């Protein structure tokens, strides 16, 4: 979320990757811009240089106009696959880890409930499942499901159970406590939270957010809180033979959420 989140990535991600022998890193970057809305080419390249292998997104993907051009030639930046047909960029892709050791499928989807108009997420998910197949054309598959409500996220988790390595929820900015491996072997968490200042209202300045709710005439457009960010996410340890999860660990690193 904004500059504090990017600062936390720059400061801590390389340490976390080294300590945990991480092969592949996915960051949802749709709130990475300075105002917390969208992402730019410069910021995406900053995240790549600081350790991201793929950047996923959600409903804020088009908040910066330049993204519509950039996403067409940068295949490591994904937008939700169930946006309207003909949208710029791609909603899923296949990538290699360093030294071409593993082949990773990454799928970016967005919920239909309480979100901007999107194509039916389950219909699109069915089509993608036929194209990216665990242990046939990829070693591992991760799904970023950007959604508003818990029930829809849980449903998509069970829908992908046993055919993907992990399904992780994004969008609500607060990490949930249901980190687990589903019955057929897919790692799951309803929402992995944000990399941002948690002494805030979902990453935005708390005083201004309260003014907004009170309809105070002095309230201004929401802007990110500026305190120390917590780096929030998950680490999945997967079985190379099956492509399924062996372990999922919730990651809460630094900032006010750990104090």
Regions found by a protein language model. Name each.
Residues 1-259:
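Acidic, metal/ion-coordinating pockets
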């Amino acid at each position: 979320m904004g500059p504090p989140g990017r600062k936390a990535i720059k400061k801590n991600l390389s340490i976390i990757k080294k300590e945990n022998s991480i092969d592949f890193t996915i960051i949802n970057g749709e709130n990475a811009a300075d105002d917390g809305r969208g992402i730019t080419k410069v910021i995406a390249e900053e995240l790549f240089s600081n350790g991201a292998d793929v950047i996923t997104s959600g409903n804020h993907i088009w908040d910066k106009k330049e993204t519509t051009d950039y996403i067409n030639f940068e295949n490591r930046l994904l937008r939700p696959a169930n946006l309207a047909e003909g949208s710029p960029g791609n909603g899923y892709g296949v990538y290699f880890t360093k030294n071409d050791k593993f082949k990773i499928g990454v799928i970016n989807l967005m919920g239909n409930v309480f979100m901007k108009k999107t194509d039916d997420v389950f219909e699109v998910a069915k089509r993608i499942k036929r194209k990216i197949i665990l242990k046939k054309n990829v070693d591992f598959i991760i799904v970023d499901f950007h959604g508003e409500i818990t029930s829809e996220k849980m449903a998509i988790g069970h829908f992908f159970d046993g055919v993907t390595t992990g399904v992780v929820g994004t969008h609500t900015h607060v990490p949930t406590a249901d980190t687990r491996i589903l019955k057929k072997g897919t790692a799951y968490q309803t929402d992995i939270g944000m990399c941002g200042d948690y002494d805030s209202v979902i990453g935005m300045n708390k005083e201004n957010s309260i003014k907004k709710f009170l309809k105070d005439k002095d309230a201004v457009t929401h802007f990110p809180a500026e305190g120390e960010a917590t780096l929030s996410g998950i680490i999945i340890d997967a079985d190379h033979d099956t492509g399924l999860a062996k372990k999922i660990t919730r990651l809460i690193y630094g900032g006010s959420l750990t104090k």
